[in-house]
Amino acid sequence: MKNAAARNRTLITVGLDLGDRRHTYYVLDEAGKMAKEGSLANTREQLATMARSYPGATVVMEAGMHSPWVSRFLQELGLRVIVANPRKTRAIYENERKSDRRDAMMLARLARMDPTLLHPLEHVSQEAQQDMLQLKLRDSLVRA
């Protein structure tokens, strides 16, 4: 199964700047040129539509509030997902002309050039995430 997934990979790279209500995306084609950019609602339906448009693509996003569920969802849809460590992506967080579009573009370009520059992270499973939340809630109740 893994070999079949690897064969279906394309050189399409999607930078995805995650937001609470909307996500901004920037797509690089096989030649590394901008193919499309825009935004989509923070819904499974919109993410699934994007995934169907770029089967086998690599999607890169920074770790944040929505990255655990978004990354898992896109992986389930067959995309390769890279979650960048936001503390290590200097080119993005130190940029004077910061914008969602620019962040999405930089994520796509960095992933295309050398994904190790993003210092990729792996999120824990959904079950482990829920267990940690229960422990935090328990600790809060004990302190109260």
Region roles according to the model:
Residues 1-144:
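Phosphate- and other anionic-substrate recognition elements at nucleic-acid/protein interfaces
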